[in-house]
């Protein structure tokens, strides 16, 4: 069964045609700058690549290109379902669901929780429904994996009315990635996922750590929004909640300006004053740039502290999993993090760690608790979850 996976951003549309069982992917594409005169879609057909301009710059136009590509490959009639990444499902969804008018309405009610993402997700779903009206379509939520967290993990110590009336609680994100790498780690370790206690670290421009026990999320570092938790590429992570009030009084900044700075001008970029790219930071740090060195030290310090905290949540730790652009490719960050986590029993294999880059995963420890590098594949996880939802739901 071929499954079409769709991931819509505020000005982009990413798609992939996958076999959920094998991971075979004969077609991928990325439409960017939607809504502008420069909109175009890059298409990858394996050995062939091309770019198609989108004069209207719309989601529906991008889907038109997708349909033409499927026809060219002779696979349009072979697509059995469409899976959509949806960033926020609030507390209404703890698993992927077949898309219905009722599901669409719930996604709309979650727009205040994800004002940049959910509207784009809805636009993509509506375009896909128009392009593939005969196919089952499934919403796979980034927040659903974390709905297994207990109240002790997801409630904030704020007035209860904020929770009951406004949904103020911790939701967590990167759930699709955390779920995928947990499954893959169990496979690599030849262990039953239901018997494993894992800490998974998704480290990219956005970063989060999750405690996974028996395949279920017990706690995670992101919260109501993706701003909470670790130091990230341009996001601050945890700061004193009194910071906005202080900056409003002392610097005359508005709430919108402070929020924008915490999301787009902070993290590794803010600390270093150079870049949010870990590769460039590592090079600058190696060249003696003290700001870059400090940014790396703070990133690793906060990461190690959070991993140790998640291990405490689990009660025992069977393995630590690194994934995401930084987690999969920065041997420096992995080594520095494990060096701070000696009390958990990690014994780094320096050679294996150095080799685990550019798509080469595997175990990077020589003894004690295993640490692994697992290449995330959110598209394949969405395809898997879509196939499960279609198989398990009535037509």
From Swiss-Prot:
Annotated site, Transition state stabilizer, chain positions: 174, 235
Lineage: superkingdom: Bacteria
Residues of the active site: 142
Q: How is the cofactor bound?
A: Mg(2+). Can also accept Mn(2+).
Q: Where in the cell is it found?
A: Cytoplasm
Which positions are annotated as binding Mg(2+)?
A: 7, 378
Which residues are listed for ATP binding in this entry? 14, 202-206, 277-279, 325-329
The GO cellular component terms are:
cytosol
Enzyme Commission number, as recorded: 2.7.2.1
Is Cell membrane given among the entry's keywords? no
GO molecular function terms attached to this record:
acetate kinase activity; ATP binding; magnesium ion binding
Q: Which cofactor does it need?
A: Mg(2+); Mn(2+)
| Gene Ontology biological process terms from the UniProt entry | acetate metabolic process; acetyl-CoA biosynthetic process
Q: In which pathway does it act?
A: Metabolic intermediate biosynthesis; acetyl-CoA biosynthesis; acetyl-CoA from acetate: step 1/2
Q: Keywords of this protein's UniProt record, alphabetized?
A: ATP-binding, Cytoplasm, Kinase, Magnesium, Metal-binding, Nucleotide-binding, Transferase
Function, as annotated, reads: Catalyzes the formation of acetyl phosphate from acetate and ATP. Can also catalyze the reverse reaction.
Give the quaternary structure. Answer: Homodimer.
NCBIfam families according to UniProt = ackA
| Name recorded for this polypeptide | Acetate kinase
